Curated annotation (Swiss-Prot):
GO molecular function: geranylgeranyl diphosphate synthase activity; lyase activity; metal ion binding
Protein's name according to its UniProt entry: Fusicoccadiene synthase
Quaternary structure and partners: Hexamer.
Organism in which the protein naturally occurs: Phomopsis amygdali (Fusicoccum amygdali)
Chain residues that bind Mg(2+) 4: 474, 478
Region of interest: Disordered: 358-404
Pfam families, per database record: polyprenyl_synt, Terpene_syn_C_2
Binding site for dimethylallyl diphosphate: 483, 561-562, 602, 609, 619, 629
UniProt entry tagged with the keyword Metal-binding: yes
Annotated pathway: Mycotoxin biosynthesis
Binding site for Mg(2+) 3: 474, 478
EC number: 4.2.3.43, 2.5.1.29
Gene name of the encoded protein: PaFS
Residues where Mg(2+) 1 binds: 92, 96
Length: 719
């Protein structure tokens, strides 16, 4: 491993207690950047979430955690990963000092933002909880924006890793009573942060480990993670013992307690056993390093990651022995104390907010402006459905016979069965995995509009029902075989049942909206739904008749079809917003924002259909070509190749036969590539991003309110 940003620490100046024999201690040359990141995270927690008491976390007077555990972190990435690490430490402290159920909620809220999807279930909507949840989401959004600005690919890998960590680790099994080390160790590896650390280090070092090596990575690093987990248990024993006592538990989720039970020994005896095991596992990991250092069958980045873990082992030891987190009598250094008390020196905290993407295209893109027609979402992800109080039309009241006989009550079980039949197609599509973009848009927009959580939840439910209803109809009308990797609903329940349920669900959503909105707001929603159907009609007309729309017609269709659910959500939130919000000032800006967002989303979706391997798994290879759908790339190519007889005929043949062969699709794709239509599409998307950033900036200025969550959503839509 090449060393650019760190230096070896003289061994005579620190202690390791023999727990990292054979491994140097290295320290970053840029450790003040860690100080900035950690202190900034702590300040933001206090500001946006609430007081967190005495400072504790990543910093140390001589050895701060990231500086010695990831000493080769690229300098420009050191502050942001230190911020992330401090945020994780604070979250860990919260889940350690609350009850099990509350800790699960804390973890679920963390995972929700990492996955950009809404977590279903009951949520405490008291002001205190609302502020905490909104504060965490704000911090996480800002954090991801900073990471995306530096390295989008690594940032997205990191987010996935962190979501997995919060899902399966992060104190999820603190109620489990482990009494055998062999059963405890797999849990400890996850809880100590294997996936969190993977995301942090790969981002910090700029590593890209191939997916097919991830399982190998886990196998090769197992000994290191066991060693680090046991190290942490030695130093966190007093903290975790006290937390268990505080909550009246008769066990501690810590190797020291487990060893005490398994070997019938006291704390000192368990400590000795634990230290011996650490030495053994460190030695085993050094053997792995020796065996793999020249193995070219393993990617270079994986070998770098294996090497980096060596310094995580030694750095964890020297930091733990001197840090205030585990050593209450130790203080911070002079600079750290000064920054904590007086605030950080002036420095741009988030350059992404001032940066616009550069457009570099060989061909001038037609820039889709945002002042044409009204704007719906066609294919945003869906969350799980929640029941509403809207009547289904099935009465539980007594029924009179024509002869005026005694009242007969409808059998309740039969009514439940009928409702289950009616809603089964909806429940099927609502159960599919979702990216949660629609809910994320609503949450981000609400950072500006500040609608109470109860009302926001109802708006999300109604928009979710409308969205899933549109998907039921779209898949049937397009004859799509797959939806998110599963058979489309009409291929499970039949076309007639699917259409019937979709129609019912649209009416149900309108009923939900009527329950919490005034008549004028309901009328706006009805108008948007009518516009949505108009856009779908044009899309179907072009497909059926083989008519090639112009780019302007294509943009208008997107505004009518894909922008409308964004528009509906915006309208409902704006009408429910506090009277202090200057509606007249921001309404036109929000109108442009939703239209641009709809265009960005639809053009990106059509583009991904042609090029994305993940999309192929979810929907099939170039499914839009099977359906005869028009994308911007295809429209651009056709208008450049109006006399290409083979191309025109293969498209006509595909429509006639209800789909194309693999070879026919590849033929069309080759022409799209030759005509640089994919490059053109990318340039249009880049221009849309510029316009969206400008629109977000205008609204931020009008409301005097930065919105990192909205900017994060925009970054996640970048190709």
């Amino acid at each position: 491993m090449e060393f650019k940003y760190s230096e070896v620490v003289e061994p005579s100046t620190y202690y390791t207690e023999g727990l990292c024999e054979g491994i140097d201690v290295r320290k970053s040359k840029f450790t003040t950047l860690e100080d900035r990141g950690a202190i900034r995270a702590h300040e933001d927690w206090n500001k946006h979430i609430g007081p967190c008491g005495e400072y504790r976390g990543t910093l140390g007077p001589r050895f701060s955690f990231i500086s010695v555990a990831v000493p080769e972190c690229i300098p420009e990435r050191l502050e942001v990963i230190s911020y992330a690490n401090e945020f994780a430490f604070l979250h860990d402290d919260v889940t350690d000092h609350v009850g099990h159920d509350t800790g699960e909620v804390e973890n679920d809220e963390m995972m929700t933002v990492f996955l950009e999807a809404a977590h279903t279930g009951a949520i405490d909507t008291s002001n205190k909880v609302d502020i905490r949840r909104a504060g965490k989401k704000r911090i996480q959004s800002q954090l991801f924006l900073e990471m995306l600005a530096i390295d989008p690919e690594c940032a997205k890998t990191t987010m996935k890793s962190w979501a997995r960590f919060v899902e399966v680790g992060s104190s999820r099994q603190h109620e489990t009573r482990f009494v055998e080390l062999a059963k405890y160790i797999p849990y400890r590896i996850m809880d100590v942060g294997e996936m969190f650390w993977f995301g942090l280090v790969t981002f910090g070092l700029g590593l890209h480990i191939p997916d097919h090596e991830l399982e190998l990575c886990r196998e090769l690093m197992a000994n290191a993670w066991i060693a680090v987990g046991l190290q942490n248990d030695i130093w966190s024993w007093p903290k975790e013992r006290d937390a268990a006592t505080l909550h009246g538990k008769d066990h501690v989720v810590n190797a020291i307690w487990v060893l005490m039970q398994e070997h019938q020994t006291d704390v000192d005896g368990a400590m000795q056993i634990c230290r011996k095991l650490i030495v053994e596992y460190v030695a085993k990991y050094l053997e792995v390093i020796e065996a793999t250092k020249n193995d070219e069958s393993i990617s270079l980045d994986l070998r770098k990651y294996l090497d980096a873990m060596l310094y995580s082992i030694s750095g964890n030891v020297v930091w733990s022995l001197e840090c205030p987190r585990y050593n209450p009598d130790v203080s911070f250094n002079k600079t750290q104390l000064e920054w904590m008390r007086q605030g950080l020196p002036s420095l741009e905290s988030c350059p992404v907010l001032a940066r616009s993407p550069e457009i570099d295209s060989d061909e001038s893109a037609v820039s889709p402006t945002a002042d044409e027609s009204d704007s719906t979402e066609d294919s945003l992800g869906s969350g799980s459905r929640q029941d509403s109080s809207l009547s289904t039309g099935l009465s539980l009241s007594p029924v009179h016979s024509n002869e005026g006989k005694d009242l007969q009550r409808v059998d309740t079980d039969h009514i439940f069965f009928e409702k289950a039949v009616l809603e089964a197609p909806y429940d099927y599509i609502a159960s599919m995995p979702s990216k949660g973009v629609r809910d994320q848009f609503i949450d981000a927009l609400n950072d500006w509009l500040r609608v109470p959580d109860v009302k926001v939840g109802k708006i999300k439910d109604a928009v979710r029902v409308l969205h899933n209803s549109s998907l039921l109809l779209d898949d049937f009308q397009d004859n799509s075989p797959l939806r998110r990797g599963k058979p489309s609903t009409h291929n499970i329940f039949g076309s007639a049942q699917t259409v019937n349920t979709a129609t019912y669900s649209i009416i149900k959503a309108i009923g939900q909206i009527m329950e919490f909105s005034a008549g004028e707001s309901v009328q706006e929603v009805m108008n948007s739904i009518m516009i949505l159907f108009q856009g779908q009609a044009m899309d179907l007309f072009w497909t059926y008749n083989g008519h090639v729309p112009s780019e302007e017609e294509y943009y208008r269709m997107i505004d009518q079809k894909t922008g409308q659910l964004f528009s509906i959500a915006t309208s409902l939130l704006l009408n429910a917003a506090d009277n202090e919000i200057p509606r007249t000032k921001i309404q036109s800006c929000l109108h442009r924002l939703t239209r641009l967002l709809g265009r960005c989303f639809q053009i990106r979706d059509d583009y991904q259909n042609l090029v994305s391997a993940d999309y192929t798994k979810q929907k099939g290879f170039c499914e839009d070509l099977d359906e005869g759908k028009w994308s911007l790339a295809l429209i651009h190519m056709i208008h450049k190749q109006r006399s290409h007889m083979a191309l025109l005929n293969v498209l006509s043949t595909g429509r006639k036969h209800g789909g194309m062969t693999l070879e026919q699709k590849q033929f069309v794709l080759d022409i799209i590539e030759e005509e640089k239509s994919l490059d053109y599409t990318r340039s249009v998307m880049m221009d849309l991003h510029v316009q969206l950033r400008a629109e977000i900036g205008r609204i931020e200025i009008l409301l005097d309110s930065p919105n990192p969550a909205m900017r994060l959503l925009l970054e996640l839509l970048r190709v």
